[in-house]
């Protein structure tokens, strides 16, 4: 299914929230969408790993890392785990690492920046709660659409047949 956030905004602007353009794409998949699953943690990724061990089919993990770019919340090992468990993508309000490996893993990843320092592996944090960054609030069960142009959020699934009929 083709995703184009620009065209989705043309069709559904009154139904979507547009995330501030603060993210870059780092994964092997450039466009992805799915139902939001949230996690909030600061410079730790143990809880992220627990969540990525779940079946992620049709889901996108939205990580509120407090905007910290001092430690990477996602690395190649976690990205492979996510891909193996069929996650559609990961949005990280924080840092990631091991870019040369991430670009070869079949998952969409958007993050603020890379840094070589790993996160602490403790599992402090909260999951399935509303998180706020990039000018929007992400609620569990919202729908997220991402590509190289940007990230948009909707409370209801968007009809992608509108794009793919062209």
From Swiss-Prot:
UniProt keyword list: Cytoplasm
Molecular function terms, GO-annotated: endoribonuclease inhibitor activity; enzyme binding
Pfam families: RraA-like
A Gene Ontology term for the protein's cellular component: cytoplasm
Any single GO BP term: regulation of RNA metabolic process
CDD domains to which the protein is assigned, alphabetical: RraA_family
Compartments it resides in: Cytoplasm
Function (record text): Globally modulates RNA abundance by binding to RNase E (Rne) and regulating its endonucleolytic activity. Can modulate Rne action in a substrate-dependent manner by altering the composition of the degradosome. Modulates RNA-binding and helicase activities of the degradosome.
Subunit structure: Homotrimer. Binds to both RNA-binding sites in the C-terminal region of Rne and to RhlB.
Family designation: Belongs to the RraA family.
Protein name listed in UniProt: Regulator of ribonuclease activity A
Organism in which the protein naturally occurs: Actinobacillus succinogenes (strain ATCC 55618 / DSM 22257 / CCUG 43843 / 130Z)
């Amino acid at each position: 299914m083709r995703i184009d956030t620009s065209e989705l905004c043309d069709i559904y602007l009154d139904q979507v929230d547009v995330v501030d353009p603060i993210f870059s794409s780092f994964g092997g998949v450039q466009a992805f969408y799915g139902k939001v699953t949230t996690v909030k943690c600061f410079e730790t990724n143990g809880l992220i790993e627990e969540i990525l061990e779940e079946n992620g089919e049709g889901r996108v993990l939205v990580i509120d890392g407090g905007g910290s770019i001092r430690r990477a919340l996602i690395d190649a090992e976690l990205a492979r785990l996510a891909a193996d468990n069929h996650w559609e993508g990961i949005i990280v309000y924080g840092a990631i690492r091991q870019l040369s490996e991430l670009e070869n893993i079949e998952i969409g990843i958007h993050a603020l920046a890379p840094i070589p320092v790993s996160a602490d592996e403790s599992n402090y944090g909260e999951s399935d709660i509303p998180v706020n960054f990039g000018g929007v609030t992400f609620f569990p069960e919202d729908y997220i659409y991402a590509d190289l142009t940007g990230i948009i959020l909707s409370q209801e699934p968007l009809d992608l047949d509108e794009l793919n009929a062209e």
